[in-house]
Amino acid sequence: MSQDLWSFCLSRLEHELPPQQFNTWIKTLQADEEKAGASVALRLVAPSRFVLQWVRERYLRRIGELGAEFHGAPIEIELVLPAAGAARPAARPVIGSGPVAGPAPAPTPSQAPAATAAAPAVVTRPAEPESSIVTASDLAYEKTRLNADFTFDTLVTGRANDLARAAAMQVAQNPGTSYNPLFVYGGVGLGKTHLVHAIGNAVYRHNPRAVIRYVHVEDYYADVVRAYQQKSFDAFKRYYRSLDLLLIDDIQFFNNKNRTQEEFFHAFNALTEARKQIVITCDTYPKDIQGLEDRLISRFDWGLTVQIEPPELEMRVAILQKKAEALRVDLHDDVAFLIAKNLRSNVRELEGALNKVVAFARFHGRGITLEVAKDALKDLLNAHNRQLTIEHIQKTVADYYKIKVADMHSKKRTRVIARPRQVAMWLAKDLTPMSLPAIGEAFGGRDHTTVMHACRTIAELRLGDHQLNHDVHVLTQVLRG
């Protein structure tokens, strides 16, 4: 009976979920008919605690609904880990069409704790606390320092990050052979850290025996200092050179730390020579990092460098909807568009604004309406709109390029004047809600087609002109505060 029920659930979920989610989370579950109790209609065995927690939080409720549909009444579902000595289900492909090579997970030496679902809308906890059992697999995952919530499934994608995501998925599928190192750069709060954790989690799911470490540069620096103080550099070197995957965040903080750069240089060489994967994040293009040795910068160019840009409107709306889903709140499109239209800088700012709206609504006992959102974000929206005026953009760009603000309105076409003016037009279009005709009017009464041409020119030049791209990036960060 359990197999028939689970086959029904699998069939329905395969049509409801994206293939990536279905193959990663649902297809790895196995129905255990022998050990299902009289009160339990379906007992599912998850291959690891990581998968168990993820399924319980995101899919168990839906499985319960399908079970009730199959039986014609609410049922109880039990979600457990393999019993001691039991063989785990084989690992399945996670991303793309091809699996990542790696040994199957080792059996988990633990008594399986259960998570149960009674009626479709209710999830109950096991009598025994799940935290009372710690397996070797749990300890191995904890040592990676990965965030289990940061996966490719939970990453909202759009034009701003589609190239970076595609490259990251290639690296996760073929660590050490595709794009080594992978260098991801972009402004604060755009999802770089999420992306590197997603790589680590994908590799770990395929190969739990892989030695993975996520480390922020400041923690790496602290490890170097500790090794120096304790005279334990041999152990330090052995550890970092034993990794299969090194994910290092915010490399720009290596600036002027000579001993740390020296150690990382040798670790980098050892890992790449052994075909081990390195993924690096930074807030700027490699050649623009201040205080970093040229030999390191040149090695960053060995692999692939990709940029994550600020999310476009549609992507910002999708990010808000995803966050609302995680918070289990109903977010209407008009509220999402209000937030997304006015807050453009990064994902953290968007999520912070949504959290503020939700808290405001709950405190006042009101639903999340457009009026409530405007009240909750009144100060933030007013400050944002005051700061990002076309006049403010013109002054900031003029100061940056050391030209006069009057040049923004003039008819001069020399390169030293025309290019900054085009940059200012591009920023005005990207950072303000002003229409193209209104922007043109603010730049000396120019036609909207001139603004369109300027924006198109800057967008195209940014693809190949690293200095211009850096200028635009810096100006954007300055203007957004």
Swiss-Prot record:
Entry keyword set: ATP-binding, Cytoplasm, DNA replication, DNA-binding, Lipid-binding, Nucleotide-binding
In this chain, ATP is annotated as bound at 189, 191-193
Protein's UniProt keywords contain ATP-binding: yes
**SMART domains attached to this UniProt entry:** AAA, Bac_DnaA_C
- Note down the stretches annotated as region Disordered: 101-123
Under the GO molecular function aspect, what terms does this record hold?
ATP binding; ATP hydrolysis activity; DNA replication origin binding; lipid binding
Annotated region Domain I, interacts with DnaA modulators: the residues are 1-74
Region Domain II: list its residue ranges: 74-144
Q: Which GO terms describe its cellular component?
A: cytoplasm; plasma membrane
Region annotation (Domain IV, binds dsDNA) ranges: 362-481
Q: Where is this region: Domain III, AAA+ region?
A: 145-361
Please state where this protein is localized. Cytoplasm
One of the GO BP terms on file: regulation of DNA replication
Stretches of Low complexity bias are at 111-123
Function noted in UniProt:
Plays an essential role in the initiation and regulation of chromosomal replication. ATP-DnaA binds to the origin of replication (oriC) to initiate formation of the DNA replication initiation complex once per cell cycle. Binds the DnaA box (a 9 base pair repeat at the origin) and separates the double-stranded (ds)DNA. Forms a right-handed helical filament on oriC DNA; dsDNA binds to the exterior of the filament while single-stranded (ss)DNA is stabiized in the filament's interior.
Question: Subunit composition?
Answer: Oligomerizes as a right-handed, spiral filament on DNA at oriC.
What family does the entry list? Belongs to the DnaA family.
Entry's free-text remark on domains: Domain I is involved in oligomerization and binding regulators, domain II is flexibile and of varying length in different bacteria, domain III forms the AAA+ region, while domain IV binds dsDNA.
UniProt protein name: Chromosomal replication initiator protein DnaA
The source organism is Aromatoleum aromaticum (strain DSM 19018 / LMG 30748 / EbN1) (Azoarcus sp. (strain EbN1))
Please name the gene that encodes this protein.
dnaA
